């Protein structure tokens, strides 16, 4: 049985490894001239970020892999989690490569990303449905041993049956792309994700998912170390390489623990960002008017006069609160 010390050690190791990898990787990215292109229609304060090296997600991925594999607590679940993280990271890397090295601003087309992401998600869903003792069941937050409302009983788990695979695919793909949308301010995606990863590390540890607890702790440490280079003013951006990898990692943990329904709660910031984009597009197409000054949501607050650092800190704090709610939801 693992204890809190192992989680703490893993976070510290991941943090140190990232601090070591950063100075080794960032100068290399600068020499490759993989600078970020900033949208002209974005906040004017962001124009100074133009040319900042991107594809920094490789630092995160390498740190997570090294930290996880040196833990001595390796099993099939850990390999699955690492494989999914790397696979989503590769999709992001291809997208970044096309945009910043081949200089094609659009990168992968949306349908290409969705096909690749969906394929990984299908494999993950099939694996879990066939190997988990819960089969196609998922845990329902907030109900404990079950509750009855107006004569209708809601049980602790719900069996999705044939809907399991499409549902898991939807949640995984939605999570991955929501994290990608969140990565728009210095330190935002890394900070939000380290908090959520810490939440999963604690839950996984208390539920006996030893390898997943280590994996989540490795993500926490990697993101914490990455903030040294990614907090305002950022020396490097994680790019799609990092955001898709982190989104895939968080989604995979939730799938393997059968708690995918907790993601919209603890990952509320992720989904607020995604929903803001969806609502903005729908509103503009139907009425010609925009709901937000700019989407994703973090840009709306920037254009409303909030400093970039204020938006980031507030979103971090909201995520801490949501993770505390998540703890109650799974208790």
From Swiss-Prot:
It is an enzyme of class 2 (transferase). Its main location: membrane. Keywords: Cell cycle, Cell division, Cell membrane, Cell shape, Cell wall biogenesis/degradation, Magnesium, Membrane, Metal-binding, Peptidoglycan synthesis, Transferase, Transmembrane, Transmembrane helix. The keyword Cell wall biogenesis/degradation applies. It is found in: Cell membrane. GO terms for cellular component: plasma membrane. The chain crosses the membrane at residues 7-27, 54-74, 78-98, 106-126, 133-153, 154-174, 195-215, 249-269, 311-331. The keyword Secreted does not apply. Pathway: Cell wall biogenesis; peptidoglycan biosynthesis. PANTHER family: PHOSPHO-N-ACETYLMURAMOYL-PENTAPEPTIDE-TRANSFERASE (PTHR22926), PHOSPHO-N-ACETYLMURAMOYL-PENTAPEPTIDE-TRANSFERASE HOMOLOG (PTHR22926:SF5). Catalyzes the initial step of the lipid cycle reactions in the biosynthesis of the cell wall peptidoglycan: transfers peptidoglycan precursor phospho-MurNAc-pentapeptide from UDP-MurNAc-pentapeptide onto the lipid carrier undecaprenyl phosphate, yielding undecaprenyl-pyrophosphoryl-MurNAc-pentapeptide, known as lipid I. Belongs to the glycosyltransferase 4 family. MraY subfamily. This is Phospho-N-acetylmuramoyl-pentapeptide-transferase. It comes from Alkaliphilus metalliredigens (strain QYMF). The gene is mraY.
């Amino acid at each position: 049985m693992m204890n809190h010390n192992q989680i703490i050690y893993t976070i510290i190791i991941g943090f140190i490894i990232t601090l070591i990898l950063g100075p080794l990787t960032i100068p290399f990215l600068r020499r490759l001239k993989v600078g970020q292109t900033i949208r002209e229609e974005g906040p004017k304060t962001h124009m100074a970020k133009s040319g900042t090296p991107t594809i920094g997600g490789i630092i995160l991925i390498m740190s997570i892999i090294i930290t996880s594999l040196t833990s001595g607590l390796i099993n099939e679940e850990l390999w699955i989690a690492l494989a999914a993280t790397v696979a989503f990271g590769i999709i992001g890397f291809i997208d970044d490569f096309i945009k910043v090295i081949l200089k094609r601003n659009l990168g992968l087309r949306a349908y290409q990303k969705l096909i690749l992401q969906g394929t990984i998600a299908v494999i993950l869903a099939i694996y879990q449905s066939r190997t988990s003792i819960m089969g196609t069941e998922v845990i329902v937050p907030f109900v404990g041993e079950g509750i009855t409302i107006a004569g209708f009983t809601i049980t602790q788990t719900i069996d999705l049956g044939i809907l399991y695979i499409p549902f898991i695919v939807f949640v995984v793909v939605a999570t991955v792309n929501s994290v990608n949308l969140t990565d728009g301010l210095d330190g935002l995606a890394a900070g939000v994700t380290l908090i959520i990863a810490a939440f999963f590390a604690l839950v996984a540890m208390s539920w006996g998912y030893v390898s997943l607890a280590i994996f989540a702790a490795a993500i926490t440490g990697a993101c914490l170390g990455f903030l040294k280079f990614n907090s305002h003013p950022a020396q490097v951006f994680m790019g799609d390489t990092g955001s898709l990898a982190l989104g895939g990692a968080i989604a995979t943990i939730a799938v393997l623990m059968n708690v995918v329904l907790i993601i919209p709660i603890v990952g509320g910031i992720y989904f607020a960002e995604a929903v803001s984009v969806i609502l903005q597009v729908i509103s503009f197409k139907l009425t010609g008017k925009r709901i937000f000054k700019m989407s994703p949501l973090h840009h709306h607050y920037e254009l409303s006069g909030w400093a970039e650092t204020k938006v980031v800190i507030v979103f971090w704090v909201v995520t801490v609160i949501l993770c505390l709610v998540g703890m109650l939801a799974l208790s």
